[in-house]
Amino acid sequence: MLLELLKAIFLGIIEGVTEWLPVSSTGHLILVQEFVKLNQSKNFLEMFNIVIQLGAILAVMTIYFKKLNPFQPGKTKRDIQLTWQLWAKVVIACIPSILIAVPLDNWFEAHFNFMVPIAIALIVYGIAFIWIENRNRGIEPQVTDLAKMSYKTALLIGCFQVLSIVPGTSRSGATILGAIILGTSRSVAADFTFFLGIPTMFGYSGLKAVKYFLDGNSLNMEQVWILLVASVTAYLVSLVVIRFLTDFVKKHDFTVFGYYRIILGAILLVYAFITFLF
């Protein structure tokens, strides 16, 4: 059991680092689990990869609790109004995922949750990040404050989030890319991605957990500990990564992540080719 818990810690670190950076946590977990794989059933592993996101979500809620809490003591009437408006934008941005991503999730997972499609998605969106950043160089963003983001923009960002239904896309990558295309600053894009992740990832993790049990699966005590340890690790690592990204985007663009995605995608393609041959 100790070895399984050590693996859970390692996978929790991978989740915490890659969930909020636009690099695809799914792609990383699949690559890492080729070498560091939990000795558990396939059904458990599929559920594990999603449910440990709860730790990452709780990190967002911890860091931004005062900003996201409309009942926070000391907030003015205007502050409370802005908080409710922010939540309204988040809810509106969730609508496309509810209407499109949820019904199609199982189909995309069955047909695209493999190394080659994930590698291609990594490369395609890596190129997109580099292209968008080069295109926007010298152009001032139109939206530099979340309070000034329109509901229409929030809805369109939600449409971009639907693209993350393709494994390897990266939920944060799709929403950040969409927000920048729609004229937001990098800071606004990152912040809204964090907030949008709360209901999206809570809902997705909840659906995966419910489906796991409805399919007749159960959890033994070892699996409970594995989920708990990985989620707590993802939470602690996410606290650091979220703060890093919010500071990073104030001085840098996302080009470096574009190159990283291309390199990782190429590595996955080479690895898939080698395993196919041998």
UniProtKB/Swiss-Prot annotation:
EC primary class: hydrolase
Chain ranges passing through the membrane: 44-64, 84-104, 112-132, 187-207, 224-244, 254-274
EC number, UniProt record: 3.6.1.27
Keywords from the named record: Antibiotic resistance, Cell membrane, Cell shape, Cell wall biogenesis/degradation, Hydrolase, Membrane, Peptidoglycan synthesis, Transmembrane, Transmembrane helix
Pfam families in the cross-refs: BacA
Disulfide-bond pairs as recorded: none
Protein location: Cell membrane
Gene Ontology molecular function, alphabetical: undecaprenyl-diphosphatase activity
Membrane-protein topology: Multi-pass membrane protein
Example GO biological process: response to antibiotic
Catalytic activity as recorded in UniProt: di-trans,octa-cis-undecaprenyl diphosphate + H2O = di-trans,octa-cis-undecaprenyl phosphate + phosphate + H(+)
GO cellular component: plasma membrane
Anything else known: Bacitracin is thought to be involved in the inhibition of peptidoglycan synthesis by sequestering undecaprenyl diphosphate, thereby reducing the pool of lipid carrier available.
Family: Belongs to the UppP family.
Function, in words: Catalyzes the dephosphorylation of undecaprenyl diphosphate (UPP). Confers resistance to bacitracin.
Name of the protein: Undecaprenyl-diphosphatase
Organism: Streptococcus suis (strain 05ZYH33)
